[in-house]
Regions:
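Cytochrome P450
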Residues: 1-352
Length: 352
């Protein structure tokens, strides 16, 4: 079973890998700001630099600060669902996107009036993460990265003069053994938190709620089958992961189950495939909210385990709790975005 063994070895750091973005590849050659915004992203770093930066970011990403957001999550979820039109409600555009972007904005300390800009930048930048990127999308991503970088620098400068109880202030103040994050590193972290946090949450909500509706299970059956909202969230993100693969390069000659992978080989870690491995999960294509094995791959693993998993879990638990109370039904079969790496729908039309 190459997939599961490879995943297991990656998570336990037995397979030495690096990311294509760690060195400037041809993909970034003409796009200075996109490269600049990715250069110190935790997703792209390895070794001591990754360890140092992740440690500093983790100190700023305080569990208590995340927990303090729960009342805001509850309020925002109820507000958006109260506004819904019973005959024309797009769960992605009218709920998931404004819900997710408002929470990331609240965490970072971004004014609500700027959330629409954040949403636009995120949509444009993440298109660069797929296999097929056309010139127009690449140019749009470059401009979005430049605008985002300039905006974040301005906000960071203001926080140094006027500190707040927000993530940007904490990132600017955190230190370890007299080591601090540079402005460039902080801005890359802000961009990562938006793109990874927002896009993943939106697509998990869309993929997951479609799964709930298509399963034909009632809210009562789902509640009876699961012991907690966390059970529901973990099963939905396993069943249809928002991130389907991650690309890396092998740093040393490696062997997995007698399969030789030469140094320098490009490998794709297929997270969605590992999550549907029948040798690991019983009836993997079925939604089972009482599943004992919750060891899926959607949060990543090892040194690259999702640093915002605690925030994402809370966002999703609050959302699905309120969505399940709505007794919504599917109004039209949704269309996939067509992207391979980041998996989601263009829309998800639901109603009473």
């Amino acid at each position: 079973n190459h997939i599961e063994n490879f995943e297991s070895d990656v998570q336990s750091s037995k397979v030495p890998l690096t990311y294509v973005g760690y060195k400037r590849s041809e993909k970034y050659e003409s796009y200075d700001y996109f490269w600049k915004s990715e250069q110190f992203s935790l997703l792209n770093l390895e070794g001591e630099l990754h360890k140092e930066l992740r440690g500093l970011v983790a100190k700023a990403f305080l569990p208590r600060a995340v927990q303090k957001l729960v009342p805001f999550m509850e309020e925002k979820s109820i507000e958006l669902l109260t506004k819904k039109n019973s005959t024309d409600f797009d769960l992605l555009k009218d709920y998931a996107q404004p819900y997710s972007i408002s929470i990331i904005g609240e965490l970072l300390g971004v004014p609500a009036s700027d959330h629409a800009k954040f949403l636009d930048w995120s949509h444009k930048i993440v298109k660069m993460y797929d296999f097929r990127v056309n010139d127009i999308d690449a140019e749009n991503a470059e401009k979005a990265a430049r605008d985002f970088f300039d905006y974040a620098q301005d906000l960071l400068d203001r926080r140094r003069v006027d500190p707040k109880d927000d993530m940007i202030t904490r990132l600017s103040q955190v230190s370890e053994n007299d080591v601090r994050l540079s402005d460039h590193q902080i801005i890359c972290t802000i961009i990562l938190l938006l793109n990874a946090g927002h896009e993943a949450t939106v697509n998990t909500l869309g993929n997951g709620f479609y799964g709930l509706l298509s399963s034909q299970k009632t809210s009562e059956q789902i509640s009876e089958e699961s012991s907690s909202m966390n059970d529901i969230v973990e099963e939905l993100i396993r069943w249809d992961s928002p991130l389907q693969f991650f690309q890396r390069y092998v740093l040393e000659d490696t062997e997995i189950d007698d399969y030789k992978i030469p140094k320098g080989s490009k490998v794709a870690i297929l997270l969605g495939s590992a999550n549907r491995d029948s040798e690991v999960f019983d009836n993997p294509s079925e939604l089972n909210f009482n599943r004992e094995n919750k060891d899926h791959s959607s949060w990543g693993g090892g040194i690259h385990f999702c640093i915002g998993a605690h925030l994402a879990r809370l966002e999703l638990e609050v959302s699905f709790k309120h969505l399940l109370k709505q007794n919504l039904s599917l109004k039209a079969e949704p269309e996939r975005t067509g992207a391979f790496g980041i998996r989601g729908y263009k829309n998800l039309l639901v109603g009473d």
